[in-house]
Amino acid sequence: MLRVAINGFGRIGRSVLRALYESGKRDQIEIVAVNELSQPEGMAHLLQYDSTHGRFLHKVTHDQEYLYIDLPNGSQDRIRIVHQADISLLPWQSLQVDLVLDCTGVYGSKADGERHIDAGAKKVLFSHPGSADLDNTIIYGVNHDTLLPEHRVVSNGSCTTNCIIPVIKAIDDAFGIESGTITTIHSAMNDQPVIDAYHTDLRRTRAASQSIIPVDTKLHKGIERIFPKFSNKFEAISVRVPTVNVTAMDLSVTINTNVKVNDINQTIVNASQCTLHNIVDYTEAPLVSIDFNHDPHSAIVDGSQTRVSNGHLVKMLVWCDNEWGFANRMLDTALVMKK
């Protein structure tokens, strides 16, 4: 059993805990503690009731020291609540923590990870790309086999790299990619205000529900980190749209091989049934973004939107639940780190 602590109980932290119980991995992973500065009442309430993912199937109660999750057999899981702002003072040693899932979005350097380790954890997995000095960055399904026992401070990438990189790999393996561009159409996030308010990014001073808002993205750097051969070959832009969850990615690539739409789509179908099973899914149904809410795949390719121009320019539409899919990959990567 892998003993895991969650640092940061926001959108991703809570999704990871819920996904553990819904994915059938609870017999392999035990959440022993959650570090969160908010009060236990709010932690329990937001775990039980979620505006995006609905009500948690298990009853959640709490006291000042623990969250309690009721199980179907009548027993309870007990999760220690910690309120510690200084990660170097976290009680990971006494709790015998094997792995910290750092879901704060605040920490992400090798030094940050080592502070968790100095506090008693054996390994750390960050929920965002982090700095370039980390031991490894894992996109599960693509390069998780590169994890080594000595890799102690690791990144799980981002929701968008987990979405697009498996698709890029499938197309590149089959046809050879020369270059590409990506537009991320991302749901609103909690760094955007409900009504206009101050922000260092002037576009993000504007009300999230009123506009389509361009934001900076380093997605191309994330691609290069996994595929160094694509250095200076990909560019990306991103916009935030007034929805609460699910992201669409518009991928355009120039490929070496002369192809037709069916060649591209069949490649994705084959990958979804083999090398990228449970990571990439494929559909041609006339679906919209909300239909992919709570989907555990990293990416869902909408084959009805695939286009090919002049045999070499390929455009694809790829969906993901940027919360739930990523949370499930955090758990997958955690189990690989256990080995």
Curated annotation (Swiss-Prot):
The record marks H186 as: Activates thiol group during catalysis. Catalyzes the NAD-dependent conversion of D-erythrose 4-phosphate to 4-phosphoerythronate. Substrate binds at S158, C159, T160, R204, T217, K218, R240. Pathway: Cofactor biosynthesis; pyridoxine 5'-phosphate biosynthesis; pyridoxine 5'-phosphate from D-erythrose 4-phosphate: step 1/5. It is found in: Cytoplasm. Its EC number is 1.2.1.72. One of its GO terms (molecular function) is erythrose-4-phosphate dehydrogenase activity. NAD(+) binds at R11, I12, N322. Homotetramer. Belongs to the glyceraldehyde-3-phosphate dehydrogenase family. Epd subfamily. SMART domains: Gp_dh_N (SM00846). The active site is at C159 (nucleophile). The gene is epd. It holds the Pfam family Gp_dh_N. This is D-erythrose-4-phosphate dehydrogenase. PANTHER family: GLYCERALDEHYDE-3-PHOSPHATE DEHYDROGENASE 2 (PTHR43148).
